[in-house]
């Protein structure tokens, strides 16, 4: 467990998260309007979205199905009876004067998700609920020095709000939870998890306490838009609360905003309670009643989920838990790996994927879907290493050319004459030359300077242009030098 260190001792973090995940649907939750990102302002707005008098909402069945599938992925209870409520508050980008949400009877509740901790152990985070609600519009304050404008394109888009219990004990655990949840949503297909575009947003409820003491007063930090900022916002807020308490002041329950430039939180408004929103069932929408048949059908349609894939990669492919988790975290990377793993050694493949391919993709700020190397061609590169056609060092050169050009490994090796030298007669000739040219080093090695062995290997590799089989060079050198 992580602690906040202060002059008076250690304090514990107590953190709960609320994740707003935009449902990957072509139409909104209660209207047929489109949901295309970055469309022209107010180009995807129906009379329902604009709250014109007499316009009634019609529930999008696809959004309901996506919420059910997400709930099943979270090992949660899917409620056969759920109700939409009106959450009443005024804001300029909320044309109805209320938000349609689910307060009393959510569609999903009582789920769990396991996350890795700093000790390497798994920790279970309880999911209190997942409910459906509509998004608000967007206020635009940078278009004019005199006016604010409203874009209702986002108004009415379906959201899943996923609420955890306060089981998270450090900023890093919060980040791990969000990363794992995002991965799950992408596998299920219910949300693309793109925090930069706002399709996944995070609110953090943060309080502090001494070990064994009751829960402290919490503050909610709104709309954190990146994994890194989740960590920064929680760290700052917890430290702020500790400083207040140690100076004899009280923490006020409130909603705060995080400023990514300053790394600080600031007051947004006093924290509302449920009574402030005057929730009541929406009279324009019937309760959602689900059948066992539908729930079972959606359960059967779920793909292999991240935890299942990790187990498979460890048992079937022999990967380490770390390697399996790194690959499975990205669904596209997992598909790439599985396609290539049928053609070569999976463990060597995983090593090259993580250390070489992912590294190059990060440098290029590219996704694996943009990679010019096909899974089949990547597998062929691994096979060339496996059968000693090329050395690992040469393979890195070949890989870099493949990454830039998309050319097949065997063609690059053939065109540039990079085939590894594994002929003992040829290598013995080179080794004899090296020994003849370096009598002092030979004498030093035989006199006990073992580190000189690396010098001889380097000389052989230099004379062969790095093409000599390093394993065979080591073996032959030991025979020649009598070690």
UniProtKB/Swiss-Prot annotation:
GO terms for molecular function: asparaginyl-tRNA synthase (glutamine-hydrolyzing) activity; ATP binding; glutaminyl-tRNA synthase (glutamine-hydrolyzing) activity. It catalyses: L-glutamyl-tRNA(Gln) + L-glutamine + ATP + H2O = L-glutaminyl-tRNA(Gln) + L-glutamate + ADP + phosphate + H(+); L-aspartyl-tRNA(Asn) + L-glutamine + ATP + H2O = L-asparaginyl-tRNA(Asn) + L-glutamate + ADP + phosphate + 2 H(+). Disulfide bonds: none annotated. Its EC number is 6.3.5.-. It comes from the Bacteria. GO terms for biological process: glutaminyl-tRNAGln biosynthesis via transamidation; translation. It holds the Pfam family GatB_N. Keywords: ATP-binding, Ligase, Nucleotide-binding, Protein biosynthesis. InterPro entries: Asn/Gln-tRNA_amidoTrfase_suB/E, Asn/Gln-tRNA_Trfase_suB/E_cat, Asn/Gln_amidotransferase, Asn/Gln_tRNA_amidoTrase-B-like, GatB, GatB_C_1, GatB_Yqey_C_2, Gln-tRNA_amidoTrfase_suB_CS. It is an enzyme of class 6 (ligase). NCBIfam families: gatB, PRK05477.1-2, PRK05477.1-4, PRK05477.1-5. PANTHER family: GLUTAMYL-TRNA GLN AMIDOTRANSFERASE SUBUNIT B MITOCHONDRIAL AND PROKARYOTIC PET112-RELATED (PTHR11659), GLUTAMYL-TRNA(GLN) AMIDOTRANSFERASE SUBUNIT B, MITOCHONDRIAL (PTHR11659:SF0). Heterotrimer of A, B and C subunits. HAMAP family: GatB (MF_00121). Allows the formation of correctly charged Asn-tRNA(Asn) or Gln-tRNA(Gln) through the transamidation of misacylated Asp-tRNA(Asn) or Glu-tRNA(Gln) in organisms which lack either or both of asparaginyl-tRNA or glutaminyl-tRNA synthetases. The reaction takes place in the presence of glutamine and ATP through an activated phospho-Asp-tRNA(Asn) or phospho-Glu-tRNA(Gln). Belongs to the GatB/GatE family. GatB subfamily. This is Aspartyl/glutamyl-tRNA(Asn/Gln) amidotransferase subunit B. It comes from Rickettsia bellii (strain RML369-C).
């Amino acid at each position: 467990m992580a602690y906040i260190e202060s002059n008076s001792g250690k304090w514990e973090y107590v953190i709960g998260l609320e994740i707003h995940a935009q449902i990957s649907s072509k139409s909104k939750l209660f209207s047929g309007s489109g949901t295309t990102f970055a469309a022209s302002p107010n180009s995807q707005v129906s009379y329902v979205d604009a709250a014109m008098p007499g316009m009634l909402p019609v529930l999008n069945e696809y959004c309901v199905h996506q919420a059910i599938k997400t709930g099943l992925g979270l090992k949660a209870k899917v409620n056969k009876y759920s109700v939409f409520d009106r959450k009443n508050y005024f804001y300029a980008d909320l044309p109805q004067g209320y938000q349609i949400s689910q307060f009393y009877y959510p569609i999903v509740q009582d789920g769990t998700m396991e996350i890795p901790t700093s000790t390497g152990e798994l920790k279970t985070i309880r999911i209190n609920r997942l409910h459906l609600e509509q998004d608000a519009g967007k206020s635009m304050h940078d278009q004019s020095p005199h006016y604010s404008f409203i874009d209702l394109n986002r108004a009415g888009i379906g959201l899943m709000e996923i609420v955890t219990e306060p089981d998270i004990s450090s900023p890093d655990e919060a980040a791990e939870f969000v990363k794992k949840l995002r991965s799950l949503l992408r596998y299920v297909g219910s949300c693309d998890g793109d925090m930069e575009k706002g399709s996944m947003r995070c609110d953090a409820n943060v309080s502090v306490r001494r070990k064994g003491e009751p829960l402290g007063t919490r503050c909610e930090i709104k709309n954190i838009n990146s994994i890194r900022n989740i960590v920064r916002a929680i760290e700052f807020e917890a430290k702020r609360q500790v400083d207040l308490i140690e100076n004899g002041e009280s923490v006020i329950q409130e909603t705060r905003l995080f400023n990514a430039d300053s790394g600080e939180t600031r007051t947004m408004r006093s924290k509302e309670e449920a009574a402030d929103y005057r929730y009541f069932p929406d009279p324009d929408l019937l309760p959602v009643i689900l059948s066992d048949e539908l729930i079972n059908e959606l359960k059967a349609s779920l793909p292999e989920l991240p935890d299942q894939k990790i187990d498979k990669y460890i048992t079937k492919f022999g990967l380490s838990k770390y390697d399996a988790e790194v690959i499975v975290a990205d669904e596209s990377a997992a598909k790439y790996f599985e396609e290539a793993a049928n053609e070569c050694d999976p463990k060597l493949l995983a090593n090259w994927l993580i250390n070489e391919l992912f590294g190059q993709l990060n440098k290029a700020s590219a996704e694996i879907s943009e990679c010019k190397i096909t899974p089949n061609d990547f597998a062929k590169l691994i096979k060339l290493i496996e059968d000693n056609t090329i050395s690992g060092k040469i393979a890195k050169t070949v890989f870099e050319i493949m990454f830039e050009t998309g050319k097949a490994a065997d063609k690059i090796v053939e065109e540039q004459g990079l085939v590894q030298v594994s002929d003992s007669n040829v290598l013995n000739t080179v080794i004899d030359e090296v020994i003849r040219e370096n009598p002092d080093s030979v004498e030093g090695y035989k006199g006990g300077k073992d580190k000189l062995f690396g010098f001889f290997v380097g000389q052989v590799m230099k004379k062969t242009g790095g093409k000599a089989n390093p394993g065979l060079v080591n073996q032959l050198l030991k025979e020649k030098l009598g070690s």
